[in-house]
């Protein structure tokens, strides 16, 4: 098989010290994008404070539901793939993914890689996911999206229930209309929905990907 530097390092350390260093064994049948759910990805997840068992179970549940489905309508994964293929058939080649939480930025780029390694890799005519520039520069996203006939599909990605939120308390009189408002709900009402409606009114296609809750289950699925 392929040379593995870490394997060679472990072997040499054992030979020279008489002690085998601790290691995580990886199933040789797991590679590529599927490595996310092997020790390659899950060790990092644990270091971040995530429950790897919960993430693996959530991903397995999605796969089992897909295998058990008798039709596209019975599988969420199949419906998402079918929609993606349909968009391409309608002449919409690029899906621009705009995230509304910093915690999504790295994940959004990873999703683009997963997309390229699945439908796109097998030659299926499906959209190309273009990760947005991120929350710190949404005005650049808007400059691109507001162009007429840009053939872009806007995907808005946000938490349904973030792990942390803030409800505005009484402060300055000029801010009284914000008292009692959740920052997250304000973001949804005043930016996400408003932008989506504007683009739809201008004949653009908008998809909302709402992750119900900020936890391992929904993050993995």
Whereabouts are the PLM-identified features?
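Active-site phosphate/pyrophosphate-binding segments
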Residues: 2-154
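Residue-level detector of flexible, active-site-proximal loop/helix-junction positions
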Residues: 30, 213-215
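Helicase-primase coupling helices
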Residues: 129-213
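Short, intrinsically disordered, charge-balanced linker/junction segments flanking boundaries
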Residues: 215-221
